[in-house]
């Protein structure tokens, strides 16, 4: 009887890529969704901000309480790396600890039943992965680590400096995936617009875009995590003019007040940030996503109102909102002028109302239109509905199109279809597949 593995990948999609590398190292295990029957349980943790850390710990404790006797519980990833000394002392529930350096050695650690924290942060090169969750879409990691010095962010302390993958490695990985039927790709990293700057080469994202365009069999691609100070008009133009990359721009701006951007050590002011955003918005059929932090130390009422005014004037398609999380080891942690939690909550509520309104407006732009959608399968909303994703959207984060009728028989998961959008139901669109 084959051994069974239950795996949980928390946090970002970059973490998911590393989880998929671990899965490929454990071919003798059969995946199970039921932790109680697993011989091996792996949790790839997130250590980014307070709520993510709490979720990681809670997941490990919950799985420990449900595991069967003689099973092995592994805690891997960012949280494990960031607090390796404390966790190993305080969590006897865990059998094997490993951080962000040993994903490709997970089979060895399990067979030897030993913990390991390599000094070097792991970056995928040509290793096999078992893609999860899709038969047509895959995430591609551009780089690991980050050279930015944002005041609020602890990631460089456990993910290290920027290390980029060579273009030829990325191209080969995509070719291998295309040969297996994958056709839609999302490129991820901590800072995608700094790709290959660790080799002293600027604007290499443009070279990557052109290299990917040469690969036969790709239907679509998009890039996440552009950093404002390293994003250039040339990059925007390369995406806008690409036959493969959709006009998708995800650039976390975090704030728009000059004084706050300076406190956050973002390396760019409001004017240049706005110039980039307006250039992105000027691209036909562009889709803009950003992230904002509310309540960073020193955020005055004036700073906040400036952000509110900008958001009401410049409409994003999607916005991730984060309450400031006070992370030890960061520059912001040492700052005075901390914002009271109740003020942060009030400001979050104001922004959340704007975000929801803008998302509905963005969705309603498609009412009455026929759009290209990937078919993802049966919707979780109802077994009578199919689930689609607009071609330009990133998976999981940008939304779902509920398909309630089709002029075509025998629809295939992973295929692109023309879907006529009939209505909006809450935060979802409803449409019909057209012949």
Swiss-Prot record:
What keywords sit in the KW lines? 4Fe-4S, Cytoplasm, Iron, Iron-sulfur, Metal-binding, S-adenosyl-L-methionine, Transferase
Q: Which PROSITE patterns match?
A: MTTASE_N, MTTASE_RADICAL, RADICAL_SAM
Per UniProt, residues of the Radical SAM core domain are: 132-361
- Residue ranges constituting the MTTase N-terminal domain according to the UniProt record: 3-115
Major site of localization recorded for this protein: cytoplasm
Q: What is its EC number?
A: 2.8.4.4
What GO molecular-function term can you cite, just one?
Answer: aspartic acid methylthiotransferase activity
User: Mind naming one GO cellular-component term on file for this protein?
Assistant: cytosol
Q: What Gene3D superfamilies does this protein's entry cite? A: Methylthiotransferase, N-terminal domain (3.40.50.12160), Nucleic acid-binding proteins (2.40.50.140), tm_1862 like domain (3.80.30.20)
Q: Which family does it belong to?
A: Belongs to the methylthiotransferase family. RimO subfamily.
Designated name of the protein: Ribosomal protein uS12 methylthiotransferase RimO
Organism taxonomic ancestry: Bacteria, Pseudomonadati, Campylobacterota, Epsilonproteobacteria, Nautiliales
**Name of the gene this protein is made from:** rimO
């Amino acid at each position: 009887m084959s051994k069974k593995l239950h795996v949980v990948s928390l946090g970002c999609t970059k973490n998911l890529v590393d989880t998929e590398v671990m899965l490929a190292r454990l071919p003798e295990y059969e995946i199970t969704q039921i932790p109680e029957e697993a011989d091996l349980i792996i949790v790839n943790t997130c250590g980014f901000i307070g709520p993510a850390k709490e979720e990681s710990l809670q997941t490990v404790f919950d799985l420990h309480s449900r595991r069967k006797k003689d099973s092995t519980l592994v805690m891997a990833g960012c949280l494990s790396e960031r607090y390796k000394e404390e966790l190993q002392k305080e969590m006897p529930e865990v059998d094997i600890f490993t951080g962000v350096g040993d994903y490709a050695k997970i089979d060895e650690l399990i067979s030897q039943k030993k913990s390991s924290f390599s000094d070097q942060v792991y970056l995928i090169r040509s290793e096999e992965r078992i893609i999860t969750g899709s038969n047509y879409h895959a995430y591609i990691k551009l780089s690991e680590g980050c050279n930015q010095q944002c005041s609020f962010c602890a990631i460089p302390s456990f993910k290290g400096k920027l290390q980029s993958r060579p273009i030829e490695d990325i191209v080969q990985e995509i070719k291998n995936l295309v040969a297996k039927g994958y056709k839609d790709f999302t490129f991820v990293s901590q800072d995608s617009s700094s790709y290959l700057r660790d080799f002293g080469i600027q604007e290499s994202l443009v070279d990557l875009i052109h290299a990917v365009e040469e690969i036969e069999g790709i239907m679509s691609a998009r890039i996440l995590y552009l950093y404002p100070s390293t994003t250039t008009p040339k990059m925007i133009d390369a995406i806008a003019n690409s036959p493969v990359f959709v006009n998708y721009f995800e650039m976390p701006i975090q704030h728009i007040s000059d004084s706050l951007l300076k406190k956050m050590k973002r390396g760019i002011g409001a004017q240049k940030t706005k110039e980039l955003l307006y250039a992105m918005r000027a691209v036909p059929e562009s889709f803009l996503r950003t992230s904002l932090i509310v309540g960073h130390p020193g955020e005055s009422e004036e700073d906040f109102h400036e952000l509110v005014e900008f958001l009401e004037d410049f409409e994003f398609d999607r916005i991730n909102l984060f309450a400031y999380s006070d992370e030890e080891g960061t520059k912001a942690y040492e700052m005075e002028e901390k914002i009271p939690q109740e003020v942060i909550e009030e400001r979050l509520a104001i922004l959340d109302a704007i975000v929801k309104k803008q998302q509905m407006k963005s969705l309603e732009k498609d009412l009455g239109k026929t759009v290209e959608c990937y078919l993802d399968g049966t919707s979780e909303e109802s077994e009578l509905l199919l689930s689609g994703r607009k071609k330009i959207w990133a998976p999981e984060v940008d939304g779902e199109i509920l398909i309630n009728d089709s002029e075509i028989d025998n629809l295939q998961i992973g295929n692109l279809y023309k879907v006529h959008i009939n209505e909006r139901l809450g935060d979802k669109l409803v449409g019909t597949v057209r012949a």
